[in-house]
Structure formats: C-alpha cells, structure tokens
C-alpha cells in the first residue's frame, strides 16, 4: 500500500512540475531590419534558426549588412559580419520582390556565398527579370537573363507544399497573401520538427483586399496554435488607425490587425491564441506614426493579446 501511495505521490508531483514549467524556446530570431520604409539601414529582414545552431534562414532581405553590423554591436554575434553573411545565413525566403524586401539581398550578393533563394513564382520572375538580369545587376542566380553566375540557386515555391531549407534542419511552406490585389505576397511557415514560426510578408486585410487569403491562412495554422506548436507570428502593421482604407496600399493598421486576430481566435479559441507571441513588423516611419501604432496596440483588447516590437540586432527566443 505504501509503495502504491509512493508511486501516486511521485506521479502527482511530476505532473505539477510539468504543468508549472514554461515551454522551452525552440527558435531564435535576429531582426536585421524592422521598418517598412525610409531608412535603408533598417528594412524588413529576420534571421531564424533553431536555438543552438547557426543554421539561419533570412526571411526577406531589405537590409542585410547594416543589420548584421547592428547585431554585432548589440552583442548578438561575436564574429565578423562576413562570417554571418557567408556561413551563418543558409538561404533567403523572399515574400515579394519590392525593394524594401530585397535590396539587401541584391547589394550583398557579390560578397555572399553559394546558397538558395526561395520565392513564389511572381516574386522570382520579378527578381530575375528586373534585378538579377545582367543590366540592373549581375545575374547571380542559376537561371534567367544574361549569363547566370550560379552563386544563388533560385527555388520557386508552390503553395501548400512543404520543402526542406537547404543546409538546415528546417522546412518552409508558402501561403498566398494579397498586397494590393491582385499583387501577391507570401507567408512562410517555418518548421523544426513539430515546432513552427509563421512570418507574413506585406499584406492587406481580407476586408479591403476582397480575398480570403488571411482567413484561409488562419484556418490552416489554427491546429498548431491549439497544440502550442506555433511559437510566434511575425505580422506587419504599417500605419496607425488614422490611415484611410483607400490609402492602405496593401498593409495593416492596428484595428485591422485586431479584426484579423478575431478571425484567428474563432478558429483557435482565445486562451490558445494568448500563448502564441505576436511580433509586429514593417512599422513605417516617421517616429510619430510608429509611436502611435505602438500606443494603439498597447490599448487593452478583448482577446488579451500582448504584442512584441522587435529591435534591430537584438536576439529574441520563441
């Protein structure tokens, strides 16, 4: 009897401990750029890697070198910037080919090492036809116009198909977004085993874009949130609420973000969504507008969500 009681007590104690423990972070995120315009030294780019590795994929690449230098200044990296660029960054996922998302990739390509660039077909075609075309810039890819130098392998992504990210232990799955309909942007679901991060490129709300892209995305990722496998969502908010819908240009405001989070919560439940970190990207200067966005998102909301504002060069764990 004592032996049985002892086993029961041990089970209860281990259960209490396990429920009291917070889930260990799985991913590290290093923002190389967090803004959506004006400052060419700080444009959208986020390094993601499993914790304990140097297997980074760069999600968008508006700023690369300046962001690496800032990360070194902040103590995130203790190696030369060339080591981060050439050895740590294993590939790039480009959500769309607007310059504030690809300029760092283009400018740094002569100094970069061989790796893969992932993008959906419209973004890939734009990069091949307008940037890496031997006229605007040398063709550092392995296909396209001019004489391909074959430094980068251009990998065109198909929606709903998961593929491995070369030289990492992660995978990527692309989902369509609307960035002034019919122009397409992309969301990337990055996975490591049963854990994931969701990164959204530029997107307008479904109500303005007249699509169901975001609703479809929320439905697809809801099971991951319910199982606490989705560690974070990186999503843009470009303008404060005062920006008229007619002048959103395929972007979100705090009120539109909250409407989209309501849709997501309908699939996941409020409590499950509260456990998933929401990281705000693509804030557009000037500083007064950014401050207003932060104030509007800091206001209490009926979902109980807390938003995270990344800082260039400062490492985060998810």
Regions found by a protein language model. Give the residues of each.
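Metallo-beta-lactamase
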Residues: 22-26, 122-185, 302-317
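Catalytic core of the metallo-beta-lactamase
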Residues: 45, 49, 156-226
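Active-site neighborhood of phospho(di)ester-bond hydrolases with catalytic His/Asp-centered motifs
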Residues: 58-62, 88-100, 118-120, 199-202, ...
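Active-site HxH/HxHxD metal-binding segment of metal-dependent hydrolases
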Residues: 79-148
